[in-house]
């Protein structure tokens, strides 16, 4: 588990996803732990963080029988964010990356915001893991569809203030990184058998 999360981290950083500095360390015996620097602290002082669950006005109860959408996060950024365009572009890049590695645990608590002087910005991405257990994202990409489909992401690109050229550029950057996932996995010590098992999680 830790090795796969570290793989996702290395791919994400290379693909332009903002993340806190992380590492993998052998803590006891043969077991490894994924370590990440806290981004809700700055020189020991608490930085105000809130999950997208909170900021979109949702609760576990309110979404029990329905699926939330990335477009709800877009709406919050448009209304309360600073550096809106850059944050929307980063969020869309994260959607594309989640599709590329099948990070299907992308629910509202796994997205967050940090309060800056002038307003809210996306927090660094966290809890990214490839998965072969689900066939769709936790969040819908449009209001109704959570398919692991790059074309679906492109269909909503205008809500993220992206031109077609900008979308293709981001897609190209993410896919060119993810296509080398097996090599990166081998470099960090993931066994060939595990790589074979996880193969279907990756698309580019």
Residue spans for each PLM region:
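Regulatory N- and C-terminal appendages and interdomain linkers associated
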Residues: 79, 120-122, 181-204
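Catalytic-core segments of enzymes that bind and process phosphorylated/nucleotide-bearing substrates
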Residues: 51, 55-71, 76, 115-166
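Conserved ATP-binding subdomain of kinase catalytic cores across diverse folds
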Residues: 1-64
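Generic, well-ordered alpha-helical scaffold segments in large soluble proteins
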Residues: 11-15, 39, 55-58, 76, ...
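Small/polar glycine-rich anion-binding or flexible loop at a beta-alpha turn
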Residues: 27-29, 91, 95, 168-179
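Conserved kinase catalytic-core segment
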Residues: 1-15, 69-132
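C-terminal structured "cap/appendage" subdomains that terminate the fold
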Residues: 158-174, 182-186
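A short beta-strand motif that forms the metal-chelation/ATP-contact edge
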Residues: 33-38, 124, 179-185
């Amino acid at each position: 588990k830790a090795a796969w999360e570290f793989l996702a981290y290395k791919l994400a950083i290379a693909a332009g996803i903002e993340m806190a500095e992380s590492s993998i360390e052998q803590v006891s015996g043969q077991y490894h732990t994924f370590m990440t620097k806290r981004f809700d602290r700055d020189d020991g002082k608490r930085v105000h963080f809130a999950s997208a669950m909170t900021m979109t006005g949702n609760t576990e109860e309110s979404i029990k029988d329905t699926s939330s959408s990335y477009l709800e996060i877009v709406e919050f950024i448009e209304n309360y964010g600073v550096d809106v365009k850059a944050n929307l572009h980063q969020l869309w890049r994260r959607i594309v990356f989640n599709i590329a590695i099948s990070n299907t645990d992308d629910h509202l608590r796994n997205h967050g915001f940090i309060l800056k002087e002038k307003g809210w910005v996306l927090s660094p991405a966290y809890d990214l893991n490839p998965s072969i257990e689900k066939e769709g994202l936790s969040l819908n990409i449009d209001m109704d569809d959570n398919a692991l489909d790059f074309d679906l992401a492109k269909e909503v690109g205008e809500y993220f203030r992206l031109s077609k050229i900008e979308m293709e550029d981001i897609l190209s950057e993410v896919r060119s990184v993810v296509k080398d996932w097996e090599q990166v996995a081998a470099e960090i010590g993931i066994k060939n058998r595990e790589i074979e098992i996880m193969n279907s999680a990756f698309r580019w």
